[in-house]
């Protein structure tokens, strides 16, 4: 199955970001990608963290997202349908259930659309990033509410295989137990992890962690990322990539800026690796 990781440098202009995302998804589809993943915060990298609150949407109907209050979900569904791809739509801010009486925070949510444009999965980011090096401080919990439920789904590819896909977002990458739990029912074939790693943490840990999660789970990892200097002054690490089950980086965008990272992932190769080193069968704890 050919997969694509989209790299962006999103801005405070939601319309421009969405149009960039649509153009890059179209480029990936034209190159033969069956599954396309957008980066975290693809629709908005605001000047302030609270900018997310202004564009937050309620969760739309899975089959009919075309409502005035859900424009982002509408365009995502239409993009998946137009190009006939599985679209793992980075993250968008979704409103917290009004019953929780929390209007100051939103969920940072990954929505997944099938090639007909139907929403088939939702994952709310569980682990919220906090960073303080004495000079810079960032705390996602100020505007985000943590999700509670790990999410995996089955994605059938055109060659007849069914891929077990586990979802994570950015900081989730640092918590291997999440992906172990996702693989309890059935081993994961692919982890998809939209991200907006800071350049500081990215230089130190991004590739290391992606390769570690691939090796631990003997699966592929698809990691679309924000990559570059944003108008808010934040620099994200980029290096969107695909990692194979042996821990080898199979494809990568090594430069800043927007782009499409394409890779053919091979289930037969993954099966061979698992036979060669059946670590998943050797677990004791």
Language-model features: locations:
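Cys-nucleophile CN-hydrolase/nitrilase-fold catalytic domain and related Cys-dependent amidase chemistry
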Residues: 14, 22-116, 124, 198-212, ...
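A short C-terminal boundary segment appended to hydrolase-like catalytic domains
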Residues: 268-285
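Active-site catalytic loop in hydrolytic enzyme cores
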Residues: 59, 97-186, 198-208, 274-279
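Residue-level detector of high-confidence beta-strand sites
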Residues: 109, 122-125, 193, 252, ...
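Extreme N-terminal starter segment of soluble prokaryotic enzymes
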Residues: 1-4
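CN hydrolase (nitrilase-like) catalytic-core segments centered on the catalytic cysteine
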Residues: 64-88, 173-260
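Short beta-strand scaffold segments in enzyme catalytic cores
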Residues: 89-90, 109-112, 151-153, 240-242, ...
């Amino acid at each position: 199955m050919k997969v694509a990781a989209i790299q962006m440098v999103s801005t405070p202009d939601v319309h421009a970001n969405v149009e960039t995302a649509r153009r890059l998804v179209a480029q990936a589809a034209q190159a033969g990608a069956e599954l396309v993943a957008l980066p975290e915060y693809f629709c908005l990298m605001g000047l302030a963290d609270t900018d997310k609150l202004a564009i937050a949407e309620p969760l739309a109907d899975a089959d009919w997202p075309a409502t005035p209050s859900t424009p982002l979900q509408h365009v995502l569904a239409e993009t998946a349908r137009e190009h006939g791809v599985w679209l793992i739509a980075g993250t968008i801010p979704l409103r917290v259930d009004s019953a929780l009486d929390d209007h100051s925070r939103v969920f940072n949510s990954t929505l997944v659309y099938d090639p007909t444009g139907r929403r088939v999965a939702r994952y709310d980011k569980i682990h919220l990033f906090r960073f303080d090096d004495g000079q810079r401080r960032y705390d996602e919990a100020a505007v985000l509410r943590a999700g509670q439920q790990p999410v995996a789904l089955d994605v059938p590819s055109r060659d007849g295989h069914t891929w077990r896909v586990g979802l994570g977002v950015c900081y989730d990458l640092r918590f291997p137990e999440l992906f172990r739990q996702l693989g309890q029912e059935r081993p994961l074939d692919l982890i998809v992890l939209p991200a907006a790693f800071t350049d500081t943490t990215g230089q130190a840990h991004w590739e290391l962690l992606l390769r570690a999660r691939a090796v631990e789970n003997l699966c592929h990892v698809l990691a679309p990322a924000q990559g570059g200097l944003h108008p808010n002054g934040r620099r994200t690490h980029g290096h969107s990539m695909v990692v194979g089950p042996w821990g080898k980086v199979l494809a990568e965008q090594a430069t800043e800026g927007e782009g499409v990272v394409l890779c053919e992932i091979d289930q037969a190769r993954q099966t061979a690796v698992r036979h060669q080193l059946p670590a998943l069968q050797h677990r004791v704890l």
